[in-house]
Every structure is written in structure tokens, then in C-alpha cells.
Regions:
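Catalytic cores of nucleotide-sugar-dependent glycosyltransferases that transfer UDP/GDP/TDP-activated
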Residues: 1-472
Length: 472
């Protein structure tokens, strides 16, 4: 089985969100299983391994009425072959997205993915495209390449990491920039706009999301950002596969960022030492209180409005809070002020610090993740890995990965409705459970034993790839 994984970002080369983690981990897990999985992505200006790249060739890529240069470079990393597509006009910029011509940039990239195959001795069985930045790959394949021998058996899978970002532009972009004539514009047109993601829904052989629950949620108008009717029509080719995490990078036994390494065998001593160090760092009291933590972007979608509503109530219960993140000014201001008002009980760090994030995973007792919507989420899995039971809302991948321990065997605490009352109730249950030390230690051990490795998810993808390759 030959897989070409097309993504606009991949760790460790370029990252703005969870897509990069998936693109950096899933192909590696597939290769370990004997799949010939390769990654293709843009060569951004910030990529640091240019001295390790091998130049392959260069060629022209159609972009509307003109052609643009594309350079092809190759590298091996962790056993995976990476192809980097170079065009300094489009990709040598500070940052990955947010430019006025993003539609043109990723129309070029999508077309270049297919043009690149003419210059490789590698023809994939499946091209796995990801999010709107590669959504035009199956569109272009069906319109301009399917009749060619090299392409006529290639199948496509489109993975939705977050349906909120669809690649929506004015209709004038289609012919002039994307090179899609008026006869075919209906494939990409939706609700009076050019919608790249809609084009992938129409033309890809399969559609996946990053968790089974999210695959069901996006059929509902509340979660779909306007695409629910189309997705219900395409439901026959939609499925959800839960993401995994890199178990080596997130390993409390070897993590150099934390003050005391530990495993299931000695988590009591390890967690206690990491908690004490975390409390010292944030000036919190060491009085036996549980520490509840958040590591997240400070936006409403992550449930910060709920946390804001109950924060003082949690502190009054005797819970200490640690918050790491940045985002909307109203939340940055509130939690900074909360730390000032409740010294010794609340610690806030505005910004992001990866080492500190790992220290929080290791040192906290519970991890808060009350998201309004969460396609998959990785933080709750990392928290389990470090023996920090999560408190999550039952949505998307949170529902698929965390089971409520108060209902029997579970690895955390859950609540269903998006309300401050239900979050507060879940926190109270967690707080009460914390003081039952024997059962709490069983919960921590159970959470640490959960297998969220990519090897599990890779098996599901391999099944999907085989099924898709055998279509017609």
C-alpha cells in the first residue's frame, strides 16, 4: 500500500495546530506497519532543515491562466520520506497562514501535489488530503488528471481536522486563480461562495474526521458551520477515526522538561515531586489541596467562559488553579486578575511555553478541558499519559477518549451540557474523589495505562485505506 499524505504543515518542520501533529505522527506509525507512506508539504521559509534537503527537480505548475515555478526537494526523517514543494513567492513568508492570497497559495499547492507525481518513481494508491489547504487535490485530480494512466487508479481521502475553516472565497477566484472553468464551478460553489472544502466533499472517495463523535456532530447545524446538509448527503462516505499522540515525546519516564521522571511503577513519588515544583513555580500553597490546570488557547470555544464563571467557586472549595495560555483579551485579563486577587491559590501564565506545559501535565492533579466543540483534542490524552485525570465535556474526541470514572472504570470526569453548573458539578466530583486516596491512585494508574498511541489509530487508517483502494 502506497500513501501520499498531503498536508500544509507537519511537525517538526512547520506547525500552527493539531494538523501538524497528525501529519508528523500518523505517517511514521504507518511506515512502522510496513506501509509506504510519504508526506508532501510546502517548503516554508521558516523550515530549519534546508541543509538536509536533496534537490530533485523543478517544473511549472498551472495557476489559472499562468504557470508558476515549483522546486521539488526530498528528505528522510524518522524513517518517513518527505517531499517539500518550493515557491518563494508563495511560501517564503513569516508564518503559515493569514495572508490575503491564501486561496491562490493553496490552489497552487494542491495542483503542485499532482504535478509532482510526474517527476517521481512513486505512484500512490491513496492521496490523503487534509483540511481546506489541500481540498482542491481531489477536485483537480478528477477534472484534469483522471484520464491519464498514471492517475486513473489513484483514490483520495479527505480528512476534516476542523470544519470551521473551509477555505471560502469570492467566486471570481475560481477561473482566474484556481483554473476551474464555469462548466465545473458548481463542484466548488456553495452558498454563493467558492468553498474549497465543499469541493473535496464532492470529489473525494472517502471523508474522514478526527474522531467518531465529531463525524456525527458535523451532521448537525450546531457544529457544521453551514455544511451539514451537504454532509448528510455524503454520509455514506463519512467516518471518524480518533487521533493518537506521540507516546515517546509525551513520556513522563523520559521527559527532560519535568523535574522528576516517573512511570506507573513510581507515579506516587513522581507526581508529588512534580506537583511541589509546580506549586513553587506559581507560588501556590502546599496544603494538600488538589491542583486543577488548563493548557489551552484562551477562547470561548475552549470553554473559558464556563471556567471564568466558576473559577472563584472552585478556589472557595479549596482547589488551586494553574492556567497557561493566550488568546482573547477578556480571558487573559480575567485570569491575570484572578491570580492577583487569589495569591497562593491561582497561578496564571499568559503566553505559551512548551516546557512549562509539560510540567503542568506532570504536576497537576486534574486537567480541565470543558470545550464547546473539540474535533479530537490531544491535551486530554497527554494528561492521561502523565497521570492527570481530565475533566471534559462530552463532545467530539473528548467523548471518545475520556470515560467518567464515577460511573465505573474510567480515566477522568465528564459532563454533557455546555453549562457552568454542569462543569462545576464535575469539578466537585473530581475534588471529592481526590480525597479518597486509594481510589484516586487507581484512577491515576488507569489513566496512565490508556493506550492513545498512533499505532492504534494507524490500524484503523490502514483498514480505511484498503477499503478505499478497492473501490470500483
Amino acid at each position: 500500500m502506497r500513501i501520499l499524505y498531503a498536508a500544509s504543515e507537519a511537525t517538526p518542520f512547520a506547525k500552527s495546530g493539531g494538523l501538524a501533529d497528525v501529519a508528523g505522527s500518523l505517517p511514521k506509525a504507518l511506515v512502522r506497519d510496513g506501509v509506504d507512506a510519504r508526506v508532501i508539504m510546502p517548503l516554508y521559509g521558516d523550515i530549519q532543515i534546508r541543509d538536509q534537503l536533496t534537490y530533485v527537480t523543478n517544473y511549472s505548475v498551472p495557476v489559472g491562466w499562468r504557470s508558476q515555478y515549483c522546486g521539488l526537494f526530498r528528505a528522510q526523517w524518522d524513517g518517513v520520506t518527505y517531499y517539500f514543494l518550493d515557491n518563494e513567492y508563495y511560501f517564503k513568508r513569516r508564518g503559515l497562514y493569514g495572508f490575503y492570497d491564501d486561496g491562490e497559495r493553496f490552489a497552487f499547492f494542491s495542483r503542485a501535489v499532482l504535478e509532482t507525481l510526474f517527476y517521481l518513481d512513486f505512484t500512490p494508491d491513496i492521496i490523503n488530503c487534509n483540511d481546506w489547504q489541500t481540498a482542491l487535490v481531489p477536485v483537480y485530480l478528477n477534472l484534469y488528471y483522471r484520464h491519464l494512466d498514471k492517475f486513473n487508479r489513484i483514490k483520495t481521502i479527505f480528512t476534516i481536522h476542523n470544519i470551521a475553516y473551509q477555505g471560502k472565497y469570492g467566486l471570481d477566484i475560481l477561473e482566474d486563480t484556481c483554473g476551474i472553468g464555469r462548466r465545473d464551478q458548481h463542484i466548488v460553489e456553495y452558498d454563493g461562495c467558492a468553498n474549497f472544502m465543499k469541493g473535496a466533499f464532492e470529489t473525494a472517495d472517502k471523508i474522514t474526521t478526527v474522531s467518531p463523535t465529531y463525524a456525527q456532530e458535523i451532521l448537525d447545524p450546531w457544529f457544521s458551520y453551514g455544511l451539514d446538509a451537504l454532509l448528510r448527503e455524503k454520509q455514506y462516505k463519512l467516518c471518524g477515526i480518533l487521533n493518537g499522540i506521540d507516546m515517546d515525546a509525551n513520556n513522563p519516564a523520559t521527559d527532560p522538561s519535568i523535574p522528576y521522571n516517573y512511570s506507573i511503577a513510581n507515579f506516587r513519588e513522581g507526581k508529588a515531586a512534580c506537583k511541589a515544583a509546580l506549586q513553587d513555580q506559581f507560588g501556590l500553597h502546599k496544603d494538600g489541596s488538589p491542583v486543577f490546570a488548563i493548557v489551552s488557547r484562551m477562547v470561548g470555544m475552549k470553554g473559558f467562559d464556563l471556567v471564568q464563571s466558576i473559577a472563584d467557586g472552585l478556589v472557595d472549595l479549596g482547589i488551586e488553579l494553574v492556567i497557561l495560555g493566550s488568546g482573547e483579551s477578556q480571558y487573559e485579563g480575567f485570569f491575570s486578575d484572578l491570580a492577583a486577587r487569589r495569591p497562593g491559590r491561582v497561578g496564571t501564565y499568559i503566553g505559551f511555553n512548551s516546557a512549562l506545559a509539560q510540567q503542568i501535565y506532570a504536576g497537576a492533579d486534574c486537567f480541565l478541558m470543558p470545550s464547546k466543540s473539540e474535533p479530537c483534542g490531544l491535551a486530554q490524552m497527554v494528561a492521561c499519559r502523565y497521570g492527570t485525570p481530565p475533566i471534559v465535556r462530552e463532545t467530539g474526541g473528548l467523548r471518545d477518549s475520556i470515560q467518567d470514572s464515577t460511573k465505573g472504570h474510567g480515566n477522568g470526569f465528564t459532563f454533557a451540557g455546555y453549562s457552568a453548573h454542569e462543569l462545576y458539578d464535575a469539578c466537585c466530583r473530581a475534588n471529592a474523589a481526590y480525597y479518597d486516596k486509594e481510589n484516586w491512585e487507581h484512577l491515576v494508574e488507569y489513566a496512565m495505562n490508556c493506550d492513545f498511541s498512533w499505532s492504534v489509530s494507524a490500524k484503523s487508517y490502514e483498514g480505511l485505506y484498503n477499503e478505499t483502494a478497492n473501490l470500483w
